[in-house]
Amino acid sequence: MAKRNIKIFSHNDLDGFGAPVLVKTVQDVMFPDAEFDLTSIGAGRIDSELDYWFKSPATATTTDVWIMDMTPDSEHTMQELNQQFANHWLVFDHHETEAALRQKFAANTIKPADAKINPSATSLVWDWLKTLPNFERLSQERQQQLAELVELIRAYDTWDWQNDPDMSEKERQAADDFNQLFWFYPLEYSEKFVQSVFDKGWTTYRQDNDLLIQTLNDRRAKYLKSHLKDVVEVTADGHQFGIVYASDYKSEIAHELPTQQPALDAALVISPKSISLRSNGKIDVAKFAETYYQGGGHADAAGGRLDINPIRLGEQAVADELEQMTSVKKE
């Protein structure tokens, strides 16, 4: 049996790690002939990362390329994948911004098994795995265990844990707790953390980390209360935005702000390198992020890159004010 060297490019959030870790979890049973190499990427960087990788010697020994939780923005990048890997590349993505481009390469795009369910990258991988012959070699118990984790990731990433009226309170809390734990660990430990949850199953992992989860929930409640007091409102592109700086809990703050202030059309949460956007339905924030922040996502939830450093600007403002105060005093 010929060995397969599969290169995976994926986003660096929970869904972005969940998708490749799911594949690695079933590797022994479903992909015994394969070796996986994962590169995690921030939003808006897939094209430049692929462009760099195409020129590397690694492409000569790579048999397949899988892209998860993101889609290249450039049709040229997709054509390059087609040219170098023919029918040996796949995209597992659900973001609306690049849906039209994925449709042009439909043969290489994994679609959800149930169109009525909002997909995530992890759920798309799961749907695809279930169509492969070796899937039945997984025990029923293991299938159920993995299906639960896939659903928790999907529910959080699509925000169904907040918006689906049919979801149980237990499942909502589990999805929230899983995501909380993910962001607690530094990025370099993200894959290891997600893999440990997939190895143990959610029930066992949650029981082992009950105190930590409670501590994180308490910390988040205080953080949101504090940061939602400092909102700057601005009118841009004909819409009213509320801007908040946050280094943590960006998605939660972005979701909560329009709820607390319904007059706002959208929340824009900034951190040193990125933005998170949430809409109340009056603006397509995916298009807004694509136009102004090299990003994208969904009509009601999106993200992008921030080219200015708000921390540096804030520090400089304090320095300028200090210089002015001290010079006035000398006079």
Where are these regions (language model features)?
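Hydrophobic, aromatic-enriched interface-forming segments
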Residues: 150-229
